[in-house]
């Protein structure tokens, strides 16, 4: 996959590179060594996809991933705590991850972004999704992400709309711009256009770039390429 991204613009010079390659934490160093193009290394970390382990284990995994070259760290909200009503425990875990990321990246003289996956399919209600969105942003997330792609219900337009509304409200109050990443269940160019339209209408043009808006699904890349090129493309 890294080699394909490295060579992508040789085949499609008019297209931008994918913003990032997403791998498990233990592959960060492998991707860093093989990387020859300008893309970020994203890791799913802290006991992805369930987030079920000791906090110390999660923090150590994040620490090692950043040490080995991760540019972005995706973690899953501690749903066991959040859904049980212990929102402070869920928030504190995000704060601790944020602290570790900043400490390790700071020693390396760089910034590493934190994305918090809400797993909206398990949160179920717009109220829960909104509460989780604000919790993650206030605890230090640079991005909020819908889903792991590992449960029955992943990204939905309703969840995306709620999350984008929360991002807009948070920005209005704090001045901070938080990114948005729908993930899971997005497989066609039409799906991608739906989420693009939500972001454009709720958040505006300042979010329509790779720094503020991502898709967390690899298969949609071929669908978008195929739609624009008007032929079947199976590059990725």
Where are these regions (language model features)?
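Metal-centered catalytic cores of metalloenzymes
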Residues: 222
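Alpha/beta enzyme core
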Residues: 1-16, 26-180, 187-218, 226-236
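Short, hydrophobic beta-strand segments that form beta-sheet elements in well-ordered domains
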Residues: 20-23
